[in-house]
Amino acid sequence: MFSGKSDYGTAAGQVACNISGPRRFKVGSIRDHVLGFRGVNGRGEIIKSGGVVVKNVTGYDLSKLICGSYGTLVALTEITFKVLPAPETSKTLIIHNQKIEPAAYFLDKSISSSNDISGAVFLPTEPKIAGCVMNIENTFKLNDLKQDGSLTAIRIEGSKESIDQRMKNLINELKIVNQNISILETHQSEIFWNKVKNLEFFSSSKNSILRIVIPPSECVKLVYQLSHKYKYYFDWGGALMW
């Protein structure tokens, strides 16, 4: 909280804003990983809740209450998280030049499959809006990307042997063997998802950015209700729209 550069986020800030990355639909939100905290309330009193083990809650779970409170309840000084092992490796399947309907179908089909995916995002090239230039080619300069256009990205993580087989299964289940696809290996996959997580797709925009959480089945309908007047992309398989 008191060290590091001011333009970097903090763990307390992430908890206070209840912000989750692209893995959220698989591993849960940050609210699901906070076990306990210490902080100072508006009266200068030290507040402590929770503990250091998973089954520690007696009474009201204040750890969940502070998530998304934007610092209005307590200034956090110490947080205990439940953490998971980092994946050994990852690969990302990129399907090129898809419109919103087939992209939403591919993401939904992937999430509901048995291939245990951990990322599902659609980055469109439309609509073209004055003053809001989003250049996918400049944002995602990766050697393994074979061509330009919209990107439908699906990530698989785990052991190398498991990933290779699950990737083959996914490609066969989506029936995209003959379509324009790219596969990002571990290093480029990490770069790609860091850019997605950090909203670099909007880095050249001076406009306000809205965050909308919706049922995945409603994402296509929402885009058409907005009459393609706004630049967007959706994450979490369509459950999160920016």
Regions found by a protein language model. Give the residues of each.
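Noncatalytic alpha-helical scaffold of FAD-dependent oxidoreductases
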Residues: 1-242
